[in-house]
Amino acid sequence: MKRFLLWVVGVILGVAVLLGAVMTVSYSFTGEGSRPAADTQFGGQALEANGSCWQVPLLGGQLDKVFASPATLTVQKLGVLYTAHPELSLPDWTCYTALTIQNAAGDVLFAGSAGEYQNFLFPANGEYKAELTAWRVPKDGTITQLRKNLGLERPAKPTGWYRYSFRFTLQASAEVELSAERVEQGGTVGVRISGMTGDAVPAIETDLGSVQCVRAAEGWRAYIPAAYNASSGGHEINITVNGETITRTLTVLPKDFGTVEAEAEEPAADSANAQFRSAIWPLYEAAATAKQWQGGFVPPAEDSMTLVDYGQIKVTNGQQGSRSNSTKLYTIPGAPCRAAANGTVVFAGNLELTGNTVVIDHGCGLRSYLYGLQEISVSKGQTVEKGQAVGALGEELTMDFKLGSRSVNPRLLFQTSGGLFWKENG
């Protein structure tokens, strides 16, 4: 019995010595290379860590080895970056980040996570300093428990952080894209402006009409109308961004819209014209709102017959008259009058000149004007969805789609054709 006990004690001591040796060897041979790679980039350049603290688990987490490198005052110089929003690329292991960005005067312009940085806009070109810390912690762990083996992961993985400090000079220039360089009368051209700093609204000047910019995912968007009566040939488009003017040329191609026999119209009363100007004309120059449509538009009248189409020359008693900036339809009385696309009602009421009238703002300066309804079922300020009834049709419906004050061809909207549908989400 005594021998057996001595043997058991010997085995236990041997195992303990062996485990101790294994732990010693494991601890000794675990170096800084056991830490996760610090593969972090900013603006396409690799960042150099200037401080770190990592807890590397040994023997399945039964033992830890800590590698600590105190943060220094060293600041990495990245030089000149030519993009308005340098991309921050992080290693796959990153769980938590803290980023601060200062201007040359030391004012903190941004303090938040890498995810929040995606929505940050640099106010201007110039010099900046940034500090970034990237952590890896187990699920349910916190950044204050890095030196504790929490046993929250199986198998155990390294936990810790890298710190980066860097300077850079931002020197970004705006980039302008047009959806097309040539457009037929009645069409539209999309404009995308990106690559600029700050939140100043770009200004677009052209003789084709008033053009307003609205915020988009990576900059600004706008739409240029080429109305039925736009002069054919080249038109200068001047885009001014942060004091820099970029010029593009847009060529308008002539289109034959044909003629149509039309009945003579009685001159409207001065009071009717004045009421219309007071109620509707201010909408032409109203501030552009965010884009609301997505995809093609639907015709306001599901079943109809065209009486006068967009751009047609009206012929009365053999005499050619004016060209139509709108489309007049023969419709089924009482049938629903539909919103052509998502939008907000900006006018709903009766006018002496146009009868029951509904105007829907679809964003980016595009509005649909619906005249001659039998009934109105929406009110000003109401949000409507594509295809939603906004009232009941009468015998005739006049529809006019305008970018600002210039009418565009509604057929292209119903066909999902033209600049209004270019890079819709970008």
Question: Where are the predicted features?
Answer:
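Cationic-aromatic interfacial patches
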Residues: 161-249, 254
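N-terminal Sec-pathway targeting helices
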Residues: 1-18
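Short, well-structured beta-strand-loop connectors
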Residues: 336-346, 378-393
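Conserved, short, structured surface segments that act as functional micro-motifs
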Residues: 358-361, 382-426
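Surface-exposed, glycine-biased beta-strand/turn segments
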Residues: 249-354
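Surface-exposed, short loops/turns at beta-strand junctions within beta-sandwich domains
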Residues: 119-129, 140, 226-233
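Zn2+-dependent peptidoglycan hydrolase active-site motif and core
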Residues: 325, 339-374, 396-399
